[in-house]
């Protein structure tokens, strides 16, 4: 029996079509009982998931149909003057508040959505 080198194998694979390579991979998975699927990162991903976000940014995505009501809601939530609130609403998407806790972000989102705005929490 003659020995086949790695270079000969690589040359043989390079000559195959994509469909033939897919069939080769399937046959190798079957023969060796393995999977060619990517292995997901284990412990590092678990550590990142354990850290819960504590500060959120409330972003006005759009003011929807009722711009006046949204401007009033923005004024009430941010303490801005009428002109500043109007400019902020018209420049959507815009950050309304940064670094707020989850409860405050959810409350602000709810009040703005009731006024007709589209809001995101990031």
UniProtKB/Swiss-Prot annotation:
<dbReference type="InterPro" id="IPR036235">
    <property type="entry name" value="Ribosomal_bL12_oligo_N_sf"/>
</dbReference>
<keyword id="KW-0687">Ribonucleoprotein</keyword>
<comment type="function">
    <text>Forms part of the ribosomal stalk which helps the ribosome interact with GTP-bound translation factors. Is thus essential for accurate translation.</text>
</comment>
<dbReference type="GO" id="GO:0022625">
    <property type="term" value="C:cytosolic large ribosomal subunit"/>
</dbReference>
<dbReference type="InterPro" id="IPR000206">
    <property type="entry name" value="Ribosomal_bL12"/>
</dbReference>
<protein>
    <recommendedName>
        <fullName>Large ribosomal subunit protein bL12</fullName>
    </recommendedName>
</protein>
<dbReference type="GO" id="GO:0003735">
    <property type="term" value="F:structural constituent of ribosome"/>
</dbReference>
<dbReference type="InterPro" id="IPR014719">
    <property type="entry name" value="Ribosomal_bL12_C/ClpS-like"/>
</dbReference>
<dbReference type="GO" id="GO:0006412">
    <property type="term" value="P:translation"/>
</dbReference>
<dbReference type="InterPro" id="IPR008932">
    <property type="entry name" value="Ribosomal_bL12_oligo"/>
</dbReference>
<dbReference type="InterPro" id="IPR013823">
    <property type="entry name" value="Ribosomal_bL12_C"/>
</dbReference>
<dbReference type="Pfam" id="PF16320">
    <property type="entry name" value="Ribosomal_L12_N"/>
</dbReference>
<keyword id="KW-0689">Ribosomal protein</keyword>
<dbReference type="GO" id="GO:0003729">
    <property type="term" value="F:mRNA binding"/>
</dbReference>
<dbReference type="Pfam" id="PF00542">
    <property type="entry name" value="Ribosomal_L12"/>
</dbReference>
<comment type="subunit">
    <text>Homodimer. Part of the ribosomal stalk of the 50S ribosomal subunit. Forms a multimeric L10(L12)X complex, where L10 forms an elongated spine to which 2 to 4 L12 dimers bind in a sequential fashion. Binds GTP-bound translation factors.</text>
</comment>
<comment type="similarity">
    <text>Belongs to the bacterial ribosomal protein bL12 family.</text>
</comment>
């Amino acid at each position: 029996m003659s020995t086949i080198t790695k270079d000969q194998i690589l040359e043989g694979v390079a000559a195959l079509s994509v469909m033939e390579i897919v069939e080769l991979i399937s046959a190798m998975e079957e023969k060796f009982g393995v999977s060619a699927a990517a292995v997901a990162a284990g412990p590092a991903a678990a550590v990142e998931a354990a850290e819960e976000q504590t500060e959120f940014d409330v972003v006005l995505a759009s003011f929807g149909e009722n711009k006046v009501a949204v401007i009033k809601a923005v004024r009430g939530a941010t303490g801005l003057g009428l002109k500043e609130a109007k400019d902020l609403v018209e420049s959507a998407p815009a950050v309304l508040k940064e670094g707020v806790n989850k409860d405050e972000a959810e409350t602000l989102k709810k009040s703005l959505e009731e006024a007709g705005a589209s809001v995101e929490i990031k």
